[in-house]
Design a protein with these regions (language model features):
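Extended carbohydrate-recognition surfaces in non-catalytic/accessory domains of CAZymes
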Residues: 1-63, 88, 116-128, 132
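Preference for bulky hydrophobic residues occupying beta-strand positions
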Residues: 49, 65-67, 96, 110, ...
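Short loop/turn positions at the edges of beta-strands in beta-sheet-rich folds
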Residues: 57, 69-70, 90, 102
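Aromatic-lined ligand-binding clefts that engage carbohydrates, nucleic acids, or primary amines
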Residues: 58-80, 109-111
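Short hydrophobic beta-strand segments in globular cytosolic domains
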Residues: 82-85
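Short, surface-exposed tryptophan/glycine-enriched loops
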Residues: 92-107
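C-terminal subdomains that position terminal phosphate/3'-OH groups for nucleotidyl transfer/ligation
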Residues: 98, 111-112, 120-122
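Cysteine-clustered segments with highest specificity for TGF-beta superfamily mature ligands
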Residues: 105-116
Length: 132
């Protein structure tokens, strides 16, 4: 099975979020790697990015979002639908199956909430993995 990766480089949009995970700040454009600033370690961050459906996929194609991060995100959504119910983890890579869940244009959302036991969220890189 052949694997192809499409890097989801910037720009990304970042929003600081409250305890309920809802945005409480204006949108700030950012690039990866993204680190939550020390001044906002008590809150969380919602990172969003749009991407187009890749060409040449069919019913046998497996699609995954892969995030390289210092910890597991609290939530991952594609087009508003949660996909983080069962992430596969290998080292610092978190893989989410999105087969059959994408449209012509898509919105990826990654939520990191603040924790008291860990350092701030760092999202190093992200990509769309195509297996088929």
């Amino acid at each position: 099975m052949k694997t192809h990766r499409i890097r989801l480089a910037g720009p990304w949009d970042s929003h600081l979020v409250g305890d309920d995970g809802q945005p409480v700040s204006e949108v700030i454009r950012c690039q990866l790697p993204f680190t939550l600033p020390e001044t906002h370690q008590e809150s969380g961050v919602l990172l969003t990015r749009g991407f187009h459906c890749p060409t040449g996929i069919d019913d046998s194609t497996i699609l995954r979002i892969v995030l390289q991060a210092n910890r597991s995100p609290n939530a991952v959504r594609v087009n508003g639908i949660a996909i983080s119910e069962c992430p596969q983890r290998l080292n610092a890579e978190f893989s989410f199956d999105i087969t059959g869940r994408i449209e012509a244009f898509n919105q990826l959302s990654v939520l990191f909430m603040a924790t008291t036991s860990e350092c701030g969220a760092v999202l190093n890189t992200a990509w769309l993995e195509i297996r088929g």
